Structures are given as C-alpha cells and as structure tokens.
C-alpha cells in the first residue's frame, strides 16, 4: 500500500488516497497468491492510515478462488461502509473472474479500453459414462444424504433440472 498525496493550491490541507495493489492469482497457497489472510492487514491499513479521502485498488488478476475473492471483496466493502471512505478500482491488464469480483467491490471502476474485463462465472465440465459402464455390466452405487448431492454425476444420464440449476 502506498499513499498518494495530492496538493492543490486552493485546498488548505493535503488530501491522501491510499492504494492497495491486488495483483496475481487469487488462492490460498503460494507466496504470491492473493488471499484474505495475507491481504487483510494491508486492506485494513489502507482504510485506517491517516485520513484518506478514498482508497484506490489496483487490480491485475485473472481470478482464482471464488471464496478468497468473496472474502477480500467483502472486507473492502465492509471497511468502506464503516469508515465512509469511497473505493475506486483501477484495472490494469486483466480483471477476469475473481479479479473482476475484486474490482466490482469498488464504488467506481476505471479500465483501459484494452484491458480484459469481466467473466464472473462458473464452468463445469464432465463426461457422460452411463452407457459405457452399462455395456460392461458395472453397477455404480452412490449414497447421499440430502437432495442434489450427486448432481451431474458422469455415470448417470443428464437431467435438465440439474443443468438449469447449475446455470
């Protein structure tokens, strides 16, 4: 985090904007991974160091863990609301998937026209193997407690209601 001091001749006091850089893959592991545990002190400091007029988040991330994206984004929103400090996101090269999630926690987003932006969503891929196992007389046994626990099981025929629920 770094503070940007802006001096304007007609203002009597210095206005500061604290900057948080959220760059890299979002996840729980690795030294350079973005995650809530590693970045919570940085984010907390951005909202409490001095009396910032705003907090700027610089985002450059292809995404990653939806849970970590949610935790970081929720922390930023909570602090912004508690301290009544606006948040501005500046997208550098890419803010896709969880990276866009982080940018979307800001009050306003700025991006270069060439930046790659967007694509929050889920992709799920699999195979339909029910005919293969039937051909070889293989019986599959699945035991679950609750509804929709084996949704889109590759060893059963696809159900439209499962597809609709996933979308």
Feature roles, as predicted:
Residues 1-85, 94-101, 105-167:
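Small-residue-centered hinge/linker elements
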